[in-house]
């Protein structure tokens, strides 16, 4: 049970849900339906948990090379790859379907596009370019957009302003982690910014 809970990266998922709730609140302008909030948060939690779990599966070999992640359920051998893959797919499909049925199709589509861009674009790029951090900020900012569309079923200028703010907010967080664990990332072959700029003078 604890290992499966670890797979959804609860700390990251919690931040995703905060962003989703913020998007709902801002879109509702004081008239937020608690049921809409509940369905948006639950559906997003399932998609986010599925994304995190599938990321564990994809990066299981890299995680085994990093001290920070070597004790995760897959590299430590506590769970088998097939179990993790099945769990991740199940969460993702349930989340997408839940959002489509109980929220709206637009929010479901954004959620699934976020999952695909995170796993199929950002994740493999981490081994190829330090610009992966910039690319990863696009799906990273999507939860606030999903919260907005859950209420409005559309994304106007205000929604994109919120998206841009969350997009920009991620960089200090990303860069701080990349700097703190630069040796780990180098060992795993991930091309984070500190590998190109060991003195820490650059933000891009």
Question: Locations of the language-model features?
Answer:
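Cytoplasmic-side transmembrane-helix entry/capping segments in multi-pass membrane proteins
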Residues: 111-114, 130-141
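Membrane-embedded alpha-helical segments that form the functional core of polytopic membrane enzymes
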Residues: 18-22, 26-60, 68, 109-120, ...
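Cytosolic, membrane-interface loops and tails of multi-pass inner-membrane proteins
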Residues: 1, 58-79, 175-201
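Multi-pass membrane catalytic core of lipid/isoprenoid biosynthesis enzymes
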Residues: 60, 68-109, 199-204
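Small-residue-rich segments of transmembrane alpha-helices in multi-pass membrane proteins
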Residues: 18-21, 73, 135-151, 200-202
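N-terminal, positively charged, Ser/Thr/Ala/Gly-biased leader segments
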Residues: 1-11, 15-22
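Membrane-interface helix caps and helix-loop-helix hairpins in membrane proteins
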Residues: 100-106, 123-131, 148-154
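Alpha-helical transmembrane segments of multipass membrane proteins
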Residues: 21-25, 93-98, 116-124, 144-149
């Amino acid at each position: 049970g604890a290992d499966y809970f670890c797979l959804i990266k609860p700390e990251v998922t919690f931040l995703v849900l905060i962003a989703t709730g913020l998007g709902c609140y801002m879109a509702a302008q004081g008239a937020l339906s608690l049921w809409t909030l509940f369905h948006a948060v639950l559906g997003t939690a399932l998609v986010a948990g599925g994304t995190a779990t599938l990321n564990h599966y994809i990066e299981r070999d890299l995680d085994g090379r990093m001290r920070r992640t070597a004790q995760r359920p897959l590299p430590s051998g506590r769970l088998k790859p097939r179990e993790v893959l099945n769990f991740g797919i199940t969460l993702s499909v349930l989340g997408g379907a839940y959002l489509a049925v109980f929220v709206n199709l637009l929010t479901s589509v954004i959620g699934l596009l976020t999952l695909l861009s995170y796993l199929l674009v950002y994740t493999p790029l981490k081994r190829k370019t330090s610009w992966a951090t910039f690319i990863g900020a696009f799906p990273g900012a999507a939860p606030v957009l999903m919260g907005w569309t859950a209420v409005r079923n559309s994304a106007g200028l205000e929604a994109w302003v919120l998206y841009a703010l969350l997009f920009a907010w991620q960089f200090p967080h990303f860069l701080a982690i990349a700097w703190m664990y630069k040796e780990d990332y180098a060992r795993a072959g991930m091309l984070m910014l500190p590998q190109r700029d060991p003195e820490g003078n650059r933000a891009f």
